[in-house]
């Protein structure tokens, strides 16, 4: 049976309880492997209003069946309750179809080593998918980011960047296959607003308001450079590839191979690859585990990413094409994240994960301004970012840089001590 075949084991009006999810998942396993499998929940990995993720032991399994699986189910609540016939952009159903189609699409490519978890099957009506269980002992990049083992972190950073490059390289030119799979499982392929156009509508007004609030004038070239960013992001040309949509450092599993296996595809689809690669530079604009990476680590990650991407995308070797496009992607995320809460100018600073919102905003402004000078593109926005960072740093009385990740602090501190002697 195809991994994208529809199942109808749960009535549409039923709320998916754990028992309902287990019965639906058992039907999927039986269709795939035969027998009469029974599932027992051994661990709840995530339980939020949007979705639940369960680890389950497989009992009475056939020889071919795995002994443990992962169930990911979508629920939603209120107006966002899951409806299999509602594929409106950004809704619960839309995220579910992205998740299922993303996993099925990557499985269909039959890559060795694999780049995703491995899909067993899904149930459209119940709103769940069953995935291979990669086990509970492995690590992600986030684990090493919190540790003090520098060699291990460098290996993890290299694997993360190479894996992104490989994922993008292997999926360029295959957007119709992804769309076909999404239709097969019940998605209606509603037109999604392009990210650059969405930035113009949602983020740029907030960024303008932030600048006005702190009395930082916009340069005359502001609108022209913003339009250029929109055009690059929405017209990716050779860089049009599959992206998971949320490549935070804990949304994958590092493996014994040089490559990671990605998961969490709720926002997956085809877009400008460098919007995802921008996570290397900023770093990680939508994630909780943000500190600062030393420049040599960023350069290493960039080289690994470009090396893998260029295997299927020769344009990635062209500095004159790659760097302006990558910088536009960084500008997109800088403007987008600064517009959230208008940069948290007033009131108390908020901590998210291992750093504060203000620390993140200053880091992104600083790194973007530095990059505009180095690459020689978007000079007006680069100058504005430099001025805005200085303005906010004074207002917030934040003189110190964002801390380095723990594994890099030891070397930095030792260097400072040696210099003081």
Could you say what each language-model-derived stretch is?
Residues 140-150:
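AlphaC helix of the protein kinase catalytic domain
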Residues 242-244, 249:
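Catalytic-loop of the protein kinase fold
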Residues 250-283:
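Catalytic activation segment of kinase domains across protein kinase-like and atypical kinase folds
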């Amino acid at each position: 049976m195809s991994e994208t075949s529809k199942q109808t084991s749960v009535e549409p009006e039923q709320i998916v309880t754990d028992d309902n999810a287990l019965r639906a998942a058992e039907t999927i396993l039986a269709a795939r492997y035969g027998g009469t499998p029974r599932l027992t929940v051994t661990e709840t990995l995530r339980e939020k209003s949007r979705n639940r993720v369960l680890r389950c032991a497989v009992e009475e399994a056939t020889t071919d069946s795995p002994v443990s699986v992962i169930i990911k189910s979508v629920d939603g609540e209120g107006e966002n309750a899951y409806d299999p016939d509602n594929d409106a952009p950004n809704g619960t159903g839309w995220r579910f179809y992205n998740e299922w189609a993303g996993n099925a699409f990557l499985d269909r490519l039959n890559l060795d080593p694999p780049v995703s978890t491995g899909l067993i099957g899904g149930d459209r009506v119940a709103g769940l998918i069953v995935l291979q269980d990669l086990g509970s002992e492995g690590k992600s990049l986030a684990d090493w980011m919190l540790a003090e083992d520098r060699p291990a972190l460098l290996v993890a950073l290299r694997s993360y960047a190479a894996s992104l490059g490989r994922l993008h390289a292997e999926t360029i030119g295959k957007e119709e296959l992804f769309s076909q799979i999404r239709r097969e499982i019940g998605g209606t392929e509603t037109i999604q607003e392009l990210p650059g156009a969405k930035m113009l509508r949602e983020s740029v007004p907030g960024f303008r308001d932030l600048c006005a609030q702190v009395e930082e004038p916009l340069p005359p070239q502001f609108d022209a450079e913003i339009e250029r960013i929109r055009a690059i992001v929405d017209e990716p040309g050779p860089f049009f590839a599959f992206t998971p949509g949320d490549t935070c450092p804990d949304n994958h599993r590092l493996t014994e191979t040089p490559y990671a296996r990605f998961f969490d595809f709720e926002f997956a689809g085809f877009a400008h690859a460098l919007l995802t690669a921008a996570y290397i530079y900023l770093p990680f604009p939508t994630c909780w585990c943000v500190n600062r990476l030393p420049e040599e680590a960023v350069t290493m990650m960039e080289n690994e990413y470009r090396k893998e991407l260029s295997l299927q995308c020769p344009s990635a070797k062209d500095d004159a094409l790659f760097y302006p496009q990558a910088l536009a992607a960084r500008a997109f995320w800088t403007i987008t994240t600064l517009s959230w809460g208008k940069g948290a100018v007033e009131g108390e600073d908020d901590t998210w994960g291992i750093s504060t919102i203000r620390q993140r905003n200053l880091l992104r402004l600083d790194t973007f301004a530095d990059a505009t000078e180095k690459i020689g593109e978007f000079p007006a926005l680069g100058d504005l970012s430099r001025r805005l960072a200085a303005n906010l740093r004074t207002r917030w009385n934040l003189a110190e840089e964002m801390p380095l990740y723990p594994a890099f602090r030891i070397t930095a501190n030792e260097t400072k001590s040696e210099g003081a002697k």
